[in-house]
Amino acid sequence: MQRRHFIARAGIAAATAALGLAAMPAQAQADKFPQRPIRLVIGYTAGGSTDIPFRVLADNASKILGQPVIVENKPGAGGVLPAQMMQSTAPDGYTLAQVAMPVYRLPYTTKINWDPVKDLNYIINLAGYSFGLVVPADSPIKTMQEYIAYAKANPGKLTYGSPGSMTTLHLTMEELAMKQGVQFSHIPYKGNSESMQALLGGHVMSVADTPAWAPYVEQGKLRLLSTWGEKRSARFPSVPTLKELGIGIVQTSPFGLVAPKGTDPKIVQKLHDAFKKAMDMPNYRESLAKFDMEPYYMNSQQYAQFAAETVKKEKAIIEKLGLAKAQ
């Protein structure tokens, strides 16, 4: 009998110890994180305006965290593949993903079994792109106000090019049309090189794009009507923003970092703090400036709120345009 009691007590003690040990590793992992290299997956090709600043950021973060942060390129599908990866990635903080704006459109354009708001753990927003609207230098349209006036006087006749249908540039131009009560005619191109040549060749009246237009503006071949950031471009300080013109649009297609759902909050906080320090270093700002970009910081809570609000806004625009796909 005594032996049975001893065995029972020993079994209870072992079970209790096992429970304690099960809880301890998670706590210890969070406290000692990171203990091995971190993968940072981005949705665009190597050598571009997204990739190059990310590599500077990763190098900065490596020095802060004491472990290598390795950038991995996973291009395709409009930049959404890294976020998709997070749905099957262990929530241990060792694989992170860049989130691009097209991720927020997925519920309305593609059949998916996950939620971009609920099924990603938002860490930090890092930066945004520079966008603007250009016309040929010899266009009779000389200001943004004249651009809108022309569209009102000529419904559906004012054409604009973008890098493609359902891109941020396309949807922002349609948001602009909705806000101003006008109708544009959209011409999608395969990229900014193609759209620039179409504009310079007189095949389209205007183009909304990233600063592929910048050298042509500086050469006097194109006229920049507006930029879309929170404040004026340092490179083109005489050009107004849509916001200051009273149009009420700020669009920089912000992007940042996420971890898989279920990642320990302590690990998320460590990652946030490290990448915040990394993005505050001068070399990161300099790497962005080469592409007319600037840091755009949001903490974890702000970034998650931004994601929730953006998903709702994208839904309204996509449904208004009749572009939503049946799920």
Curated annotation (Swiss-Prot):
GO cellular component: a single term: periplasmic space
Segments crossing the lipid bilayer: none
Domain of life according to the entry: Bacteria
Location of the protein in the cell: Periplasm
PTM text: Predicted to be exported by the Tat system. The position of the signal peptide cleavage has not been experimentally proven.
Primary localisation category: periplasm
Cystine bridges: none
Short name of any one Pfam family annotated for the protein: TctC
Protein name: UPF0065 protein in gbd 5'region
Organism, as annotated: Cupriavidus necator (Alcaligenes eutrophus)
